[in-house]
Each structure stands twice: as structure tokens, then as C-alpha cells.
Amino acid sequence: MKIHDFKMKKQEQKKISMLTCYDYPSACIVAESNIDCVLVGDSVAMAVHGHPTTIMATIEMMELHTQAVARGLGKQFLITDLPFLGHKSSQGHTVENVKRLLQAGAQAVKIEGADKDTCQTISHLVNAGIPVMGHIGLTPQSIHQLGGYKVQGKNSEQAETLLQQAATLEQAGCFAVVIECVPQDLAKTITDSLVIPTIGIGAGPGTDGQVLVWHDMLGLQTSFNPKFVKKYFRAKDHFIEALNSYVQQVQQMHFPANEHSF
């Protein structure tokens, strides 16, 4: 998938599929699938490193995981999150951070928020030829300011703010916008108001595409079960079953067998 395919898919009313990915083996699997695009999300701090929030993601962490995913990925378009405070200092520092992610293999960056400074930064990056994906609604990097993980845009004032933010991000040059944890009617209204595509997570079926976290949709963990996640596989259960089978065969001397020995 190429950058121009995002807008084309919206025009042709073809849904966009996006999935997070954090390592080389997973990227190799994704490469053999029909997934359109991959996000090396700052959720890696939680899903892989065990931190309680995405705020703990660093530019070094994002760079390392982007390199790993890029080595294994195929035709999918690769986007990487600019981590917490990665664009809140000088524009020069922001460009340097983005440069590191692009050199690591990212084809675009995703930036959370739509305040004046953020939109100016996005415009600066886009004018420099760097594709940027926006992100509104529940923005995990602002979790403390938002008062926790909860649905955004539930009242008319918040809804109007999100509509304005989406329009501002489009004007700033974003090629797509993630809408997270927003009522489905509002997400559909935002989607219909934009020329660029929207990617939803917890935003209903009316967005131009969907994104889920690898570990959530494959059932690799069972402690985090938000309403918007559908588990397409019970990986954790199958992994435990395989591990216990290995232990049993070792204890009963069924492994290694002759075919596993020299």
C-alpha cells in the first residue's frame, strides 16, 4: 500500500485495515496477510514492555521496534507513533526525532492531538515531505489530562471540538486521522466531513478503516478487555497448552524422540 492509496480507498469506499506490530516475527506473519497498513504504536510500552501507560515510550524504543518491524514487513504501509513529548519541544528537535523513525523504516509518523502547536508542527513536517497521520478522541499520551481511559465526545461541546480538530488536522496536511473511543454517530459525522480517511478504534463501523492492537485481537493477553476489542484467536490459551505439552513430553521422555536426535 502506498500513501496515495489511503485517499483512493476512501473515494472508492473500500475499508482500510490497520494493525499494530512491534517485532520482526510478527511482521513476517503480517507480511503474508492482507492487512493494508501497520502501526508501530507507542502502545508497545504497555503491550511488550509492561508499562502501565504509553507515556513511557521513548524515541529510542520506537526506533528499535520500527527497525525490527521494517525488516519483516512486506507490502504493508508502515507508520510509527511519535512518542510522548516527541513533538512538544523545538521544531528542530521534532524533525530530528521524525528523521530517526523514518531512517528506521517508517514511511509516515502518527502524532496525537490537534492543539495549535501540534498542528503547526504537522504542517511543518508535511511541508518537508513527511506524511503525518493525526489522532483525536481518546489520546493515550494525554491520559492524565483526560481523566483516564473513557469515551470522548459524549456531549455537544466535546463533539464540536472533535469536529473542529479533525478539520484542523486535515487542513494541516494529515493524510489520515485515527479516531479513538468516540460515539459511533459522531465518528461517522467526522468521517463524512473529511476528504481524508479516518481509522477508527472504538469508534464504530462508520469510519473509513479500523485498527486494533496485535496482542488484543489475537488474544495474547486476557487482563485488558475493552468493549471495542474483538478477539479473533485465543493465542494465550493455545500457547499455554503447547508449553504444558512440552513439559509433559520432557518429563515422560517422549521428547526428544529419535527424529529429533542425531
Swiss-Prot record:
Its cofactor is Mg(2+). InterPro entries: Pantoate_hydroxy_MeTrfase (IPR003700), Pyrv/PenolPyrv_kinase-like_dom (IPR015813), Pyrv_kinase-like_dom_sf (IPR040442). Pathway: Cofactor biosynthesis; (R)-pantothenate biosynthesis; (R)-pantoate from 3-methyl-2-oxobutanoate: step 1/2. Its EC number is 2.1.2.11. CDD domains: KPHMT-like (cd06557). GO terms for biological process: pantothenate biosynthetic process. Gene3D superfamilies: Phosphoenolpyruvate-binding domains (3.20.20.60). It comes from the Bacteria. Binds 1 Mg(2+) ion per subunit. One of its GO terms (cellular component) is cytoplasm. Mg(2+) binds at D42, D81, E112. It is found in: Cytoplasm. 3-methyl-2-oxobutanoate binds at D42, S43, D81, K110. It catalyses: 3-methyl-2-oxobutanoate + (6R)-5,10-methylene-5,6,7,8-tetrahydrofolate + H2O = 2-dehydropantoate + (6S)-5,6,7,8-tetrahydrofolate. GO terms for molecular function: 3-methyl-2-oxobutanoate hydroxymethyltransferase activity; magnesium ion binding. The keyword Metal-binding applies. The active site is at E180. Keywords: Cytoplasm, Magnesium, Metal-binding, Pantothenate biosynthesis, Transferase. Catalyzes the reversible reaction in which hydroxymethyl group from 5,10-methylenetetrahydrofolate is transferred onto alpha-ketoisovalerate to form ketopantoate. HAMAP family: PanB. Homodecamer; pentamer of dimers. Belongs to the PanB family. This is 3-methyl-2-oxobutanoate hydroxymethyltransferase. It comes from Legionella pneumophila (strain Paris).
